């Protein structure tokens, strides 16, 4: 039987050598607070590429300084960021992996000095209260995502992911729990989708490569979006040309989350089948057998691995051995891998 985890995957002309994706995870390591790539980032991402991950997604990268989660986040709001990102892409490509970047804005969850912005002036838990965005600020943010995509293209990335999850700005617009606007960007689901729809459209004016969106497909709170809402959103995104939905969950408001191995896989499965769009499964996927089951049963198209790759950069090899197969690695490691 073919091991689907190690089969190739083609998306809009980009071929991934396997179905293993390094999920975007903030490293908070831009220690000069300028959003620039540091040596740690390069070694961090290159080591996972050497470990034979098929697609590396660089962590949430802020499209504006105000859109950072912390002062130590990566940024893509300036052309000064391009050279470091270019080197990162080159080091990822050197090992046969493809490179993606997650474009992000933290919204009300930005832990920064000065004012922060969100769809409505509602704080997250005990954090700072944001300013409700003006229409001018909304337009500026949409433009910032477009310019971020253009810089990502110049840096050589193969894929872009838009961060629409975990209670950050786009998620805040999507959710009725955080979006209390009475203008064209609030109210109905269609209106709450307007920001993301316009961001997608603007990015597509400068980027014709694969485009993913990460969503929190469960909000775990009364009055929030339901899975049926996210299926509708996924259908709209497919019509716009989105290639894959990365299905995470939670964090739009403080709420208990029932966590167990593969707990978010049913979200990816439902959206894949109901919206007829490719999905990525993420969340406590820790073994090759578990990942293979998800793919063989057509519950998702790609496997996004997060903390397991922090623990073990060579997890793909471990997964292969568990499945009774072998994969190649850096020739320098042959005496250990063969």
UniProtKB/Swiss-Prot annotation:
Residues annotated to bind substrate: 28, 163-166
Cofactor: FMN
EC identifiers of the protein: 1.6.99.1
Origin: domain of life: Bacteria
A Gene Ontology molecular function term of the record: NADP binding
Gene3D superfamilies reported for this sequence: Aldolase class I (3.20.20.70)
SUPFAM superfamilies assigned to the protein according to its UniProt record, in alphabetical order: FMN-linked oxidoreductases (SSF51395)
Catalysed transformations (reactions): A + NADPH + H(+) = AH2 + NADP(+)
Binding site for FMN: 23-26, 60, 102, 214, 306-307
GO biological-process terms attached to the record: response to toxic substance
Keyword annotations of the record: Detoxification, Flavoprotein, FMN, NADP, Oxidoreductase
Regions that span the bilayer: none
InterPro entries: Aldolase_TIM, NADPH_DH_bac, OxRdtase_FMN_N, YqjM-like
Subunit architecture: Homotetramer.
The protein's role, per its UniProt record: Catalyzes the reduction of the double bond of an array of alpha,beta-unsaturated aldehydes and ketones. It also reduces the nitro group of nitroester and nitroaromatic compounds. It could have a role in detoxification processes.
Family the entry assigns: Belongs to the NADH:flavin oxidoreductase/NADH oxidase family. NamA subfamily.
Official protein name in the record: NADPH dehydrogenase
Lineage: Bacteria, Bacillati, Bacillota, Bacilli, Bacillales
């Amino acid at each position: 039987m073919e091991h689907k985890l190690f089969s190739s995957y083609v998306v809009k002309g980009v071929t991934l050598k396997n179905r293993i994706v390094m999920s975007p995870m903030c490293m908070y390591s831009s220690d000069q607070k300028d959003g620039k790539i540091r040596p740690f980032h390069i070694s961090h991402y290159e080591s996972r590429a050497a470990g034979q991950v098929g697609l590396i997604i660089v962590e949430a990268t802020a499209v504006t300084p105000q859109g950072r989660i912390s002062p130590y986040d990566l940024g893509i709001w300036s052309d000064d960021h391009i050279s470091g990102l270019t080197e990162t892409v080159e080091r990822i490509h050197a090992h046969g992996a493809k490179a993606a970047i997650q474009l992000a804005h933290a919204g009300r969850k930005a832990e920064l000095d000065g004012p922060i912005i969100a769809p409505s002036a509602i704080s997250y838990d005990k954090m700072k209260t944001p300013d409700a965005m003006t229409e001018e600020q909304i337009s500026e943010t949409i433009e910032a995502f477009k310019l971020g995509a253009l810089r990502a293209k110049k840096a050589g990335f193969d894929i872009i992911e838009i961060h629409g999850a975990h209670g950050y700005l786009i998620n805040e617009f999507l959710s009725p729990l955080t979006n209390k606007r009475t203008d064209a960007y609030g109210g109905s689901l269609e209106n709450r989708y307007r920001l993301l729809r316009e961001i997608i459209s603007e990015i597509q004016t400068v980027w014709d490569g694969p485009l993913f969106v990460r969503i929190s497909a469960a909000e775990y709170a009364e009055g929030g979006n339901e899975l049926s809402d996210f299926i509708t959103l996924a259908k709209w995104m497919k019509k716009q040309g989105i290639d894959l939905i990365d299905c995470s969950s939670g964090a739009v408001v403080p709420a208990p989350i029932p966590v167990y191995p593969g707990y978010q896989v049913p979200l990816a499965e439902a959206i894949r089948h109901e919206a007829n769009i490719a999905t990525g499964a993420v969340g406590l996927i820790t073994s090759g057998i578990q990942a293979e089951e998800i793919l063989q049963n057509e519950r998702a198209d790609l496997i996004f691995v997060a903390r397991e790759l922090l623990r073990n950069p060579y997890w793909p090899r471990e997964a292969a051995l568990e499945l009774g197969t072998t994969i190649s690695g850096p020739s320098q490691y042959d005496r250990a891998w063969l």
